[in-house]
From Swiss-Prot:
Residues 129-552 form the Topo IA-type catalytic domain. GO terms for molecular function: DNA binding; DNA topoisomerase type I (single strand cut, ATP-independent) activity; zinc ion binding. It comes from Helicobacter pylori (strain J99 / ATCC 700824) (Campylobacter pylori J99). A zinc finger (C4-type) spans 572-598, 616-642, 663-689, 702-725. Keywords: DNA-binding, Isomerase, Magnesium, Metal-binding, Repeat, Topoisomerase, Zinc, Zinc-finger. Its cofactor is Mg(2+). This is DNA topoisomerase 1. The keyword Metal-binding applies. CDD domains: TOP1Ac, TOPRIM_TopoIA_TopoI. Belongs to the type IA topoisomerase family.
Amino acid sequence: MKHLIIVESPAKAKTIKNFLDKNYEVVASKGHVRDLSKFALGIKIDETGFTPNYVVDKDHKELVKQIIELSKKASITYIATDEDREGEAIGYHVACLIGGKLESYPRIVFHEITQNAILNVLKTPRKIDMFKVNAQQARRLLDRIVGFKLSSLIASKITKGLSAGRVQSAALKLVIDREKEIRPFKPLTYFTLDALFEPHLEAQLISYKGNKLKAQELIDEKKAQEIKNELEKESYIISSIIKKSKKSPTPPPFMTSTLQQSASSLLGFSPTKTMSIAQKLYEGVATPQGVMGVITYMRTDSLNIAKEALEEARAKILKDYGKDYLPPKAKVYSSKNKNAQEAHEAIRPTSIILEPNALKDYLKPEELKLYTLIYKRFLASQMQDALFESQSVVVACEKGEFKASGRKLLFDGHYKILGNDDKDKLLPNLKENDPIKLEKLESNAHVTEPPARYSEASLIKVLESLGIGRPSTYAPTISLLQNRDYIKVEKKQISALESAFKVIEILEKHFEEIVDSKFSASLEEELDNIAQNKADYQQVLKDFYYPFMDKIEAGKKNIISQKVHEKTGQSCPKCGGELVKKNSRYGEFIACNNYPKCKYIKQTENANDEAKQELCEKCGGEMVQKFSRNGAFLACNNYPECKNTKSLKNTPNAKETIEGVKCPECGGDIALKRSKKGSFYGCNNYPKCNFLSNHKPINKRCEKCHYLMSERIYRKKKAHECIQCKERVFLEEDNG
């Protein structure tokens, strides 16, 4: 009888299967096999506590049946889902669905997907950690309660489609606060006095008549000119020369947040893209040794490194760079995050032997770039510090002092691998008390800059420092805010949209703890305590739920509705009522103000450019774009009285290329294409790129696997569906 190993992803299952003999069967759960019901709160709440109502997703039902049948035939079923709390919970749900005692399922975890790692963990299984599971359940229930209850309230007071959530709203407030600093900012002009002394010493005025000048202090142009005129007449000497040796410490290896930050700044990758590529590198790619994982687990807040990996790195440094670059002892790093899960490892290559050059014919260009970044950072983390000599020279006269600074690299250390963008700034050879001639003195104007908007990388850095969310939530949180149209990211800068201001205004006034970073961080600590058996998850939920629901009820009464519908001056053709403009998550539309008694609606004039000025040849009505399982088409807005439809293929204004959506594989344009079998969406770079989708791709990312989403009709309901993992979100629902 075969042994069964259950992992999360098909790619991981395929890789692991290559390492094992025929006595093992490896199957993927494809993420969560069950979750809270999507069409209700999904939690029973009474005096006994909080009972989640888990439902198997329709797309997982056949898979679950398959896993149950395989488990019945297996002598041992190993739960080998990811090592974080989410993975522990997925393993727990799989075991529950199979049935039997939880203790009967050996639990194995691995930081890397290599043959040795897999064979070793099979020898040392443990049990499913219910404390970790309860921590994940508490997080899931908390987020559902906040999202479901608060989103419903926000949508009822502002407009349908808006949402709020425990982590997303705290993150959004950071963006809003920065916008509030930027919008009223008024630039200030200030002046500096910059001198050039012979032989070529550049210095800046730091004090005048015994008073030190503060940064941006000199704002009067006339005053700056007067000081310049006075100092030009003075004689100068070298007042002091200070030289100091300074170390540039080696950077630690990557954890999730720092990998996302570096990939953003150095490679231009979004956090979502970084995690998607990292997942592929972790789960298994082609190498000269066969298919295997080439990096360790990518969702981690730990800086620990396995002893064997440290020894490999040190041996590599000694061999390739010599003993001068090798510290006496291996360098050990610890995370600044007090809640870091130190049992995990930092992100590193699974084998230091697999140099980037050895993989250039096996990895895609972007995979190779990210792997190279991880490889070099890990190897550099075990090298000697770089050493600099800093110089500071003060030039003085009776009325003022000028200062010049320089730096010289003495030993490159870790820069040997990572490179050094800072060029040496060498100062001329000088002696204290020697006279020096002023060659030129200039008064230069400068303008203060507003606070910089967050980039995705800098926002993640702040979220991490404040304890908001965990490594697994940083990228999905930013994607979620984009998908909700709260923020936009242009040229690496995050700016808030107007709907975000309205939501945060309400939350700050009525639910201040939801947007308080300290509150969010304290909840993360509570979840950590649950995972460590220091807190009861039912009590944590209870302590949060009842005060929160009191505020929800108060909000229903006290929050003033901001829904204002613009009048069109037109009458409803069905009941004679007034037509007004409304908004939904699908955009602007026109509806009768007698709703719900009258349900007449039509689209605005600027909606759906494809249908603009297109009239129904049967009744004279307006042809509007609609969607079916076969894609987009035109239909008369007088349906059901008129059932005229028209293919977009024959529409003069139809757009073949999808605006604002790029291919997730190569970055090319995506266009509607046709074959004998029907229409589909494909990449314009075909045949170099084979991306295709049966449904129209949209500029949103899957919150589960971060791949591109599509829009479709599923069982007569509008839905967004991931093109890769098929995760589906019905647009009628909004759980936040």
